[in-house]
Amino acid sequence: MTAFHSSPRMLGQKQDKFWLTVGLCALTAALIFLPFYLLDGGFFHYAGDFNSQQISFYRYMNGFLKGAGYPAGYEGVKNTFSWATDLGSGTMNAYSFYLYGSPFFWFSLLFPQNWLPYLMVPLLVLKFAVAGGGAYLYLRRYVKDPNFAVLGAALYAFSGWGLYNIFFNHFLDVVALFPYMLAALDDAVIDDKKGVFPFW
């Protein structure tokens, strides 16, 4: 067969359902958040820290890292100190816990600052999709039927802990990325593929 045609599956070979799992988790998350997103006019207002911190932190740091908010003639090093945070604070100290370690935050920098309040739901959908995909990669090694890995991945992604802690948006980064670390550890220990795990 040519490179453009896949070879037929051998008897007993597992079918990879990674993208199915990612899509299923993204669709499920979209169905969960979409009614609230529409009722709130494109915003997702949840509770507590999500409204007062998470949305504003994403929006503020998006503009801050792009150079917004500096006084005219400012000669200092940009993007390191914020007078708008607390009584003035180094941004690495103030935002590393919430944002700087999050690949989802860095992805959000591709969009304009004013879009960030509207992007919170798409970012949440992405986090749940990534969590489901990672859980599938980890679980598929331990099941005979890949459908059980899909089911386990969906149960992991939409566990009570993950859904409850939506208002701590940065907690979901751990839910999304942890299964990839587990899968990489299994690859290193079981399959002796040591290339990926050191990066975790």
Q: Can you name each region flagged by the protein language model?
A:
Residues 1-37:
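Start-transfer (signal-anchor) and selected internal transmembrane alpha helices
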Residues 9, 17, 75, 82, ...:
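Coil-to-alpha-helix initiation sites in intrinsically disordered, low-complexity, charged segments
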Residues 13, 48-49, 102, 145, ...:
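Intrinsic-disorder/low-complexity, polar/charged segments
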Residues 29-132, 154-176:
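Membrane-interface coil-to-helix junctions
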Residues 111, 142-143:
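A broad structural signal for alpha-helix termini and local helix breaks/kinks
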